[in-house]
Every structure is written in C-alpha cells, then in structure tokens.
UniProtKB/Swiss-Prot annotation:
Catalytic activity: 5-(2-hydroxyethyl)-4-methylthiazole + ATP = 4-methyl-5-(2-phosphooxyethyl)-thiazole + ADP + H(+)
Protein name: Hydroxyethylthiazole kinase
EC number: 2.7.1.50
Organism: Bacillus mycoides (strain KBAB4)
Binding positions (substrate): 45, 194
Database matches in Gene3D superfamilies: 3.40.1190.20
Enzyme's top EC category: transferase
Family label: Belongs to the Thz kinase family.
Length: 269
C-alpha cells in the first residue's frame, strides 16, 4: 500500500458520487451532509423505521452513529443494518460515548453483535469499551487514557471481524493483520463539534467505492487530515469558526496530488 494508490481513492469517490445513508445524531446532521457534499458524495439522512431498510438497500454505504441516543434510532439502526447486510452494503459504526453510561455502552455492544460491520470508528476509549476493555472516559468526547491503542484496535478488529479505526493524535487502522498509522490532521479539529462524526461518514464514502476497507479507511483518514492541515494553515489564527468554513472548502478542493505530497502514513505490520 503506497501513497499513490491511496491518493487515487479520493478521485474515485468524486467520479462515483456514492450515496451514503447516515443515521446520525442531531448535533452533526447539517455538518455531515455539507461535508459529504463538499467531498463529492451524496448524503441522505433517513431515520424513519418505515423506510430505513429500503434506503439502506440502495446505498453505497450505511453509517450508524449513536451520538444522541434514543430507542427509536436504535430500532432504525438495526433495521437498516440488517438490510444493508442482506444487500451487501458496507456498514460503518461510530459508537459515540461508549462507556459514558450503561445504556450507551449496552447499545454500543449490541449493534456489532447484531450487524456485520465493515468498519468501526471511534476514539480509544469508545473502542475499548465496545470490546469490554477498561479505559477512562468522561462524557462523549473522551479519548485519552492509559493503554496500547494499537493493541486495542487489533483486538477490536479480531473480536468484531471488522476494520477497526481509532482516531486521536495518531490514527490507527487495522483488520487485525495489516496495521497502518496516519499522522495527518490538526488539533483545531477538536474545537469544532462533529468533525469525528463527519469523518466516519467520509470513511463511508471511501468504503463505498473501494472494497479493500483497510485501504479505503487509510485513504479517507489521510485525505481528511490533509484537508484539515490546509484549512488550518489558512485560518487557525482566526479561530474555529473560520476553520470550519475553510475545512468544508478544503474537503472540496484537496486533491489526490495534495494527498501524495502531504500524506503521512506508516505501515507497522
């Protein structure tokens, strides 16, 4: 896996304009839709249990995000996820805040038990709690703590039979056998709500067009991080509001050549 072939996946996304079905949270819906549109994907936000199975069946990817968790959304996620599995549509899961409350943790463990996942994406604390490993968490945005992030990612990939993505200062992508670190991004991403949730949906767009899900995830993370770096270089002195707008611009403007030039990945296994 080299930077040139990784960089070409973004071109494939823009050529294919994949439909990404998001069952996401109320905080990030608008930002997620605009981010996917800027990238070149086609977002749809369909939540009603009466239509989610049908919508998921025709999507390029299904993204399940439990940020603002309610029983109605859990039911919709299960219906959509099982339909996606039946129709060979890749499912991505963002277990937002797993470990913060008993209900949230229960749902975060139940969904992977019921639905086959192509990718699970979260911070270290969230992924650790999904697989019942101890890790500190406070609220839904905690990701720091003590532990080996690569080992947690590999364990999650093995136990859930999926590609595990753990994001933080360094991002980890693994299927349990291949493990890659991505070192792109900028700290100001943490000052804009929804950047992690949007990232999961962006990975969904890449997974929709690249069936090697490790490669797709690495490409998405590298693209996202490079776009953030470029946006920050133009706006960081102005603050997160200016960054958010410029970041959407860079999701549209960052090219495969930019990824080749600025991408920072390391294959560690």
């Amino acid at each position: 896996m080299n930077m040139k072939e990784i960089s070409k996946v973004v071109d494939l996304v823009r050529e294919s304009n994949p439909l990404v079905h998001n069952i996401t949270n109320v905080v990030v819906t608008n930002f997620t839709a605009n981010g996917l549109l800027a990238l070149g994907a086609s977002p749809v936000m369909a939540y009603a249990k009466e239509e989610v199975a049908e919508m998921a069946s025709i999507a390029g990817a299904l993204v399940l995000n439990m940020g603002t968790l309610r029983p109605e959304e859990v039911e919709a996620m299960l219906l959509a996820g099982k339909s996606a599995n039946k129709n060979d549509v890749p499912v991505l899961f963002d277990p937002v805040g797993a470990g913060a409350t008993s209900y949230r943790t229960e749902v975060a463990r139940y969904i992977p038990a019921e639905i086959d996942l192509a990718v699970i994406r979260g911070n270290a604390a969230e992924i650790a709690n999904v697989i019942n490993e101890k890790w500190e968490i406070k609220g839904v945005d905690a990701g720091t703590g003590n532990g080996n992030v690569v080992n947690i990612a590999k364990q999650a990939a093995d136990e859930l039979n999926t590609v595990a993505v753990i994001t933080g200062q360094e991002d980890v992508v693994t299927d349990g056998e291949r493990t890659i670190l991505i070192r792109n991004g900028h700290p100001i991403l943490t000052k804009v709500t929804g950047t992690g949730c949007l990232l999961t949906s962006v990975i969904g767009a890449f997974v929709a067009v690249e069936k090697d899900y490790v490669k797709a995830a690495v490409a998405a993370l590298t693209f996202y991080g490079v776009a953030a770096e470029i946006a920050a270089s133009k706006t960081v002195e102005n603050g997160p509001g200016s960054f958010q707008i410029e970041f959407l611009n860079q999701l549209a403007n960052t090219t495969s050549d930019d990824i080749e030039k600025y991408g920072k990945i390391e294959v560690i296994q």
